[in-house]
Amino acid sequence: MSGLRPALSTFLFLLLITGGVYPLLTTALGQWWFPWQANGSLIREGDTVRGSALIGQNFTGNGYFHGRPSATAEMPYNPQASGGSNLAVSNPELDKLIAARVAALRAANPDASASIPVELVTASASGLDNNITPQAAAWQIPRIAKARNLSVEQLTQLIAKYSQQPLVKYIGQPVVNIVELNLALDKLDE
């Protein structure tokens, strides 16, 4: 019985620290230092939540920039279905899937002459990616300019405005948040 008391007191102490103090402290610090990020990086227009800067949305119309394909096919960009869902490079199903995506992109973007950027035909690891490169966004400009009756220059400037540089200059590449870019595109129509 004498050996049980130290084990029980250690258990209760660690339970208090890891189950109470640590979660409350990290939540409080997150809310204090990073309130926007700690609350989901929600994009708001007035009182309406339009999306999250962290999760892509299924923009399918010709007047919108399209993001990376969602790996959660039945319900695109569903965070509850997220996970390692990409097929292996050696899987013949991946070739068929990419060929179908290429054909769909070519059909939707007949005026685009350059080769299709790889991120427009491959899903990210989570299947929820909200970012593409500025080059992938620029590849879609002819379709969007035609659908929205906007100039190529207007769309190029919009992409440049919403492009984010990597935190460290030589590590990573610039990206464009598709949700923010498409919401800005809708504001041009107002």
UniProtKB/Swiss-Prot annotation:
Underlying gene: kdpC
Source superkingdom: Bacteria
Entry similarity comment: Belongs to the KdpC family.
GO cellular component: plasma membrane
InterPro entries the UniProt entry points to: KdpC (IPR003820)
Chain segments annotated as transmembrane: 10-30
Role according to the record: Part of the high-affinity ATP-driven potassium transport (or Kdp) system, which catalyzes the hydrolysis of ATP coupled with the electrogenic transport of potassium into the cytoplasm. This subunit acts as a catalytic chaperone that increases the ATP-binding affinity of the ATP-hydrolyzing subunit KdpB by the formation of a transient KdpB/KdpC/ATP ternary complex.
NCBIfam families per the UniProt record, alphabetical: kdpC, PRK00315.1
Name of protein: Potassium-transporting ATPase KdpC subunit
Keyword presence, 4Fe-4S: no
Presence of keyword Transmembrane helix: yes
Subunit structure: The system is composed of three essential subunits: KdpA, KdpB and KdpC.
Database matches in Pfam families: KdpC (PF02669)
Residue ranges the record marks as coiled coil: none
Membrane topology: Single-pass membrane protein
GO molecular function, one term: ATP binding
Keywords recorded for this protein, A-Z: ATP-binding, Cell inner membrane, Cell membrane, Ion transport, Membrane, Nucleotide-binding, Potassium, Potassium transport, Transmembrane, Transmembrane helix, Transport
Main location, first listed in the record: membrane
Cellular localisation: Cell inner membrane
